[in-house]
Amino acid sequence: MPLCEKGNDPIDSSTIDSLCAAFDKTLKSTPDVQKYNDAINTIFQLRQKSESGKMPADLTNSEALKDRQKIEEILTRSYQDHSESRVHLSKLIQNDIPFALNLFEILSRSSIHVFVGCFSNKDATIALLNELQIRIHYGEDTHVTYLLSIILQLLNKFKYNFKEVRFLVKELILRISEDEVKSMMLIIFAELQSSFQKDFDKAVVDFMSSLIVEAEIDVGNDPLSIIVKTLSELYPSLTTLCSEIFLTKGLSKLFKKRVFEEQDLQFTKELLRLLSSACIDETMRTYITENYLQLLERSLNVEDVQIYSALVLVKTWSFTKLTCINLKQLSEIFINAISRRIMPKIENVNESAVKLEEVPKVEMSVEALAYLSLKASVKIMIRSNESFTEILLTMIKSQKMTHCLYGLLVIMANLSTLPEESNGSSQSINDLKNYADLKGPGADKVGAEKESKEDILLFNEKYILRTELISFLKREMHNLSPNCKQQVVRVIYNITRSKNFIPQCISQGGTTIILEYLANKQDIGEPIRILGCRALTRMLIFTNPGLIFKKYSALNAIPFLFELLPRSTPVDDNPLHNDEQIKLTDNYEALLALTNLASSETSDGEEVCKHIVSTKVYWSTIENLMLDENVPLQRSTLELISNMMSHPLTIAAKFFNLENPQSLRNFNILVKLLQLSDVESQRAVAAIFANIATTIPLIAKELLTKKELIENAIQVFADQIDDIELRQRLLMLFFGLFEVIPDNGTNEVYPLLQENQKLKDALNMSLKRGDSGPEFSAAIPVILAKIKV
């Protein structure tokens, strides 16, 4: 059907409609290439209606472009389906770049790859870059996000000389006040710095220097605000470069003149935002404290900028230098800002009705309290404020507060941290590096107070467990950022420090959260991973594995437990290996957790044993720990092996396949370990031998001839007969061995056992004592009946 455009010649859209109709049908082959070219030609006929490539509004809203989805589908399929139609489309685009831009930018962002793909080499894009520069410079094109997305794809696809893209530095900085430009600028600048670091840095410094000159002679379009806004945005990604510019001679003087002499409140806000961003640099924190403290303290008395200045004071972490406010008063500014003025408005009205200036104040207050809640005095203050704590929980669960969620979770993680956990391995997490890589806040002890462990436990029970916060976070985990997930792990870790809280933590999904978090390995090299592994070990130590592993198999936990164990050589799959923050306690608790898993009477227990034994790096770790010089570690390893013997067929080959050199080595080690000075370790070793002797007769038969084993066992049995548990295990070993000795009447004699007076005397002594227990005492006469001395 022909379309008429305001008295002009009609445009026949039938080619567009018929091709789209063909797309809707299931065809064994794509339509003929000519149909694609005809449809493209129809679309590009619209340029006849435009002036200098500018598509007028009446044409943009015309019937021909009413269904933009059809237009986009034709352009995309023409690019994808036939090389001939791709060439034709590319030619039309390159012949009239202004019109092509106007056409494509009214389509969805997914069409960008088609547009950029129509330029096969860098030289072909130079005209496009020139057109883009013009449009960005004049700012008349309302589709700036689309234009900048094209630039980003061009930078990724082609290797330009910096001179060809240098214009981006100036043009984007000059439009820093526009939100659409600001967000894309950060991505584009990151790409430019990656490809042209030296040239890019120089271009930024040079242009910012020119803006400083303009500010000094008071010309240009508010160059000082442009400088402040640009530095604020670039500081997180280009910290060193921004600090170099910030420290430019004379710039501080210009800033202070604008604030104090001209009393420009809006500029003061912008400057305070910059100071807040600059605190990411330790050098700048010192500089700000030394040069801007007067500004910061005076700004505390101006309501509109009070929170802005208070946040900077917090982030400089220089509380000893404050003269007009103390730590408690500083904290109250943010608590009051949320609980009295801001939070009620956000919760009680539609999000669209909230004043724009209130949302940043919420964000800043949360950020400040995330820092301040590292301080014991502030934590005590917040925990004692029941209504404010409930507000924090409401904010966490509010769909309107997702932009603050990371800071809120940091606060809850800090509040739930027990006093003994405030230092050591968790300190590197408490530095809130995801905000500003703040270094060494713990060095300042101002405001330090002693926290009560009992108060923290009450807080954790009331505000985390009873409110089912962990259940809520489990449901939301798939929506959370990696940084937020780390703070969830911290909260769960803190809860698992109390044995009594572990069942509730597990029932709310704590184990699932930790397993899924660790499995994603988004935190390789991060200290937070240690906390995740520690939380898992605590849950596994104090809980029946059968009650935990319903959604997942117990096998899923094994890799993370072994991450806490020392290995002889570093391996890629252990992101924590050789990490100095892994303590002996971590090793010990990981072994206890493995022991609990291995001792499960369900099929999971046997599968755990099989997995450990069959995984070379895991078993190598166990073998090394058997000989560890640390007694608790060695003991726990032997107890793990002893528990694994409840599934003897799984592990027998590792110790009792005596034809295998490594197995024989392990066997000989076990024999010697029977004489360890640590009695609990001896019990574990004795249990290993007792278990194998009473469950696998073929192995028991072979053990009858092992002189060192029998001599050591009898020696320990006789010398340490007072230890009932050790005696019981050795009795079962002897019972298993004597069970496989043939009855009288055969020529088969085993003098090591049957003609051993020392063993006979010790057995009689055990029988006489009468404290071995009915089952074990009943075995003694059976053994004595086969002794021939």
UniProtKB/Swiss-Prot annotation:
Family matches, as SUPFAM superfamilies: ARM repeat (SSF48371)
Compartments annotated for it: namely: Cytoplasm
Q: Which Gene3D superfamilies match?
A: 1.25.10.100, Leucine-rich Repeat Variant (1.25.10.10)
What GO molecular function annotation could you give as one example from this UniProt entry? Hsp90 protein binding
GO cellular component, alphabetical, reads:
cytoplasm
- InterPro entries per the record? ARM-like, ARM-type_fold, UCS_central_dom
List residues, modification Phosphoserine: S18
Keywords for this protein: Cytoplasm, Phosphoprotein
Question: Which BP terms in the Gene Ontology apply to this protein?
Answer: actin cytoskeleton organization; chaperone-mediated protein folding; intracellular mRNA localization; mating type switching
Disulphide connectivity of cysteines = none
* Miscellaneous field: Present with 3410 molecules/cell in log phase SD medium.
State the function annotated in the UniProt record: Required for mother cell-specific ho expression. Might be required for the transport of factors (such as ASH1) that promote HO repression from the mother cell into its bud.
Protein name as it appears in the record:
SWI5-dependent HO expression protein 4
Task: Name its species.
Answer: Saccharomyces cerevisiae (strain ATCC 204508 / S288c) (Baker's yeast)
At the highest ranks, the source species' classification is:
Eukaryota, Fungi, Dikarya, Ascomycota, Saccharomycotina
